[in-house]
Amino acid sequence: LHMKWFVLLLLTVAVLPAQGQKIRVIAFGAHPDDCDIRSAGTAALFAQMGNAVEFVSVTNGDAGHQVLHGKELAERRLREAKESARRLGIEYQVLTNHDGELLPSPEVRKQIIRLIREWKADIVLAPRPNDYHPDPRYTGVLVQDAAYMVVVPSVVPEVPALHKIPVFLYYDDGFQWLNPLRPDIAVRLDDVIDKKIDALDSHVSQFYEWLPWVAGKLETVPKDPSERKAWLKIQRTPAIKPDVRASLVKWYGAEKGNSAQYYEAFEICEYGAQPDDHRIRELFPMLR
């Protein structure tokens, strides 16, 4: 019984940085470009405000191309990830797990726990465990499984355990099964949308080669670099759904919320700390 109440206490106290300290955000994706798709705009805003952001690709992306494979592709995708990080002003780690082979094993879970602790994360971003692709699906499971373990000293004992469980958030993904994402937090991207597209543009192997090829639309990709970015912006800026619009209005007020054209949205995971609205505003200082 005592342990139950202790866990509830950990979940209801959101991790807040001390006055004047940086907010520390770590985002997990299955492949080197996944974090960028779901959170590059939010990352840019955090970075511009002097906070610390790290993207982590849980696999090395060595299978996602129609021509390149293995080590050659992994090295190219690492270079692309580092260029994206440079453009956003953040850190980017790419782990060595193979693309298409990720499993929610204890070994990979320990990698996730270690990274969250080493980053001393206040906020952890990850996919929901319901993707069509097994790698993002299992990335979601791995991060969920790490959520409580980051405060357990005997697990990964070589890295000091966190004192409080961070806020864990799911990316918006568009999937309806088992249930659609609930946009608890919606971030207005109008001031940084070009920076987000610039980050995506770093991943040439994906957005201009592999993904158009696998969709049967490679011939639609423009050759001119400036035209490519305009094309990519159209591909990667979804329409704002009514529930997202309502969330934007909640956080930004009617004028800014209703005029927003671009966004990223997140759902609070019940396995992490449960912040109230006041604490969300402290952790997301751009919500104003």
Name what the model sees in each region.
Residues 136, 141, 170, 185-187:
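Functional cores that coordinate and move charged inorganic groups
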Residues 1-2:
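Short, Lys/Arg-enriched N-terminal segments with co-localized hydrophobic residues
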Residues 65-68, 179-183:
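Short acidic, glycine/proline-rich loop/turn micro-motifs
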Residues 5-14:
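Sec-dependent N-terminal signal peptides
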Residues 115-161:
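Active-site adenylate/phosphate-handling loop in enzymes that bind or generate adenylated species
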Residues 18-119, 141, 149:
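Active-site rim/loop-helix segments in enzyme catalytic domains that contact anionic ligands
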